[in-house]
Design a protein with these regions (language model features):
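A surface/secretory-pathway sequence property marking extracellular, secreted
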Residues: 41, 92-135
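Beta-strand-rich extracellular modules
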Residues: 29-31, 88, 178-182
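C-terminal, structured domain-capping segment
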Residues: 64-83, 141-212
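Gram-positive cell-envelope targeting signals
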Residues: 1-49, 70
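Beta-sheet-dominated interaction scaffolds and their linkers
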Residues: 45-67
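Beta-strand-rich interaction surfaces with strong enrichment in secreted/lumenal proteins
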Residues: 55-58, 134-146
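Generic short beta-strand segments
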Residues: 50, 88-90, 157-161
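Short acidic, flexible loop segments centered on an aromatic residue
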Residues: 41-44, 79-94
Length: 212
């Protein structure tokens, strides 16, 4: 890949909670049998970025705003669900190897990662709360019912810090967004944790798997 001054790339991965098995229960009387079939539903979401070009963005300069709108959408056949998202920032070279960013002899990698994280949060849409575990939780359940919300945009753009300079020349930064979902109905009382403003800040005792 031809090196550019500054290159921005994004990888988005969607992980979802699952329920996807079918069971058959038979009930018998003295004279006849009755068979009731109960089929479980599923929780399934997609994650895409309609405003971000598939080929990525190149020749980025400090203070440039990049359109980036991670959008979580409930599948049309999915049960209602709560969603959360994680954002991870990394700096890599042209071969995808992790880089350390130095300025004036000081390692500023974590500082610069935090700056990009803050840039994402600066355009975060309403309804999201940063949880105690680093995830961002959407406080409205997604549903395909009439007049319901079936998608949520995490944030709308990222602005590269104006103070950055030659220390990031020929560097790519990657913003990985991961989305997860959990069924909204019939959860145990202790699964969702709320803050003092009644915003979701954690899913306790939940193992997330991909729904195929």
């Amino acid at each position: 890949m031809k090196k550019k001054k500054v290159i921005t790339m994004v990888a988005a991965v969607a992980l979802v909670a699952i329920v996807g098995v079918a069971s058959t229960f038979a009930y018998f009387t003295d004279s006849e049998s009755v068979q009731n079939v109960i089929t479980f539903g599923n929780v399934n979401i997609s994650l895409d970025e309609p405003s971000f070009p598939e080929e990525g963005v190149t020749d980025v300069v400090p203070n440039q705003t990049i359109a980036k709108n991670p959008t979580i959408t409930l599948d049309k056949d999915s049960n209602d669900a709560y969603v959360r998202a994680a954002v991870e920032v990394s700096f890599v070279d042209a071969d995808g190897n992790a880089l350390t960013i130095t300025k004036d002899g000081k390692d500023v990698t974590e500082e610069y990662k935090a700056a990009l994280q803050a840039a994402c949060e600066a355009t975060m849409t309403s309804g999201w709360t940063k949880g105690t575990d680093g995830y961002y939780y959407y406080n409205t359940e997604l549903s395909n019912a009439d007049s319901a919300v079936n998608s949520a945009v995490l944030f709308e753009s990222v602005t590269v810090p104006a103070a950055w300079g030659n220390e990031i020349a020929n560097v790519k930064f990657v913003i990985d967004v991961t989305a997860e979902a959990i069924q909204a109905d019939n959860l145990a009382d202790d699964v969702l944790t709320y803050d003092e403003n009644n915003n979701i800040v954690s899913w306790d005792q939940v193992t997330v798997e991909s729904f195929e």
